[in-house]
Amino acid sequence: PEFRQYFFEGELDGKPFNRRQRSIVYQRAKNEKQTISFGMQDEPNRIGYEWAAHSIYPKKNDFSQFRVTIGNSQCSKPYSASIFNISAMSYGALSKTAISSLNEGAKMGNFAHNTGEGGISDYHLKGGDLIWQIGTGYFGCRDGKGHFNDALFVEKANLKEVKMIEIKLSQGAKPGHGGLLPAEKNTPEIARIRALEPHKTVHSPS
């Protein structure tokens, strides 16, 4: 194998990554130059080689093709959703700067931002459309005993930013065990957002 790798294999041989791909990783890790002047190692005329060609008259994009309407005639407020959106990531798992940036990006790009099961924070309200995710812990719409709170739900559901509500049926990352918010992470701000008592460990059922 050593002779094959160092003496006989070409730059484009080897699996799962060839020598050229491995070299790029090494160079980037060392912050070294990644470009080579003149010529190329690949054969652009070979069958299967793919490239992008410039067009003198580029086609105009029909952005309506990248949206889908959610809700039929029975829905009072159907939503025109982008096919590309921001997946569920809670405030607490991500910083306030990250959540604010993602939401502002959703506003600029006209797509939706999933809150994650951690509730709707102030940083989610930067003008982007929201998909409010409600998990097994009912964060943001629960009472002091952890039961579903109708009044809090109605209050959050009526926010103009909330376009859809997603019900998370189980803890997929920890099946059979449920989630856990440690007491040290349950700060007064997190507790306010999630309708919790601060500085106490909180379990989310599986």
Predicted segments with their positions:
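Glycine-rich phosphate/ribose-binding loops and adjacent secondary-structure elements
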Residues: 200-206
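Active-site pocket-lining/capping segments in soluble small-molecule metabolic enzymes
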Residues: 171, 176-197
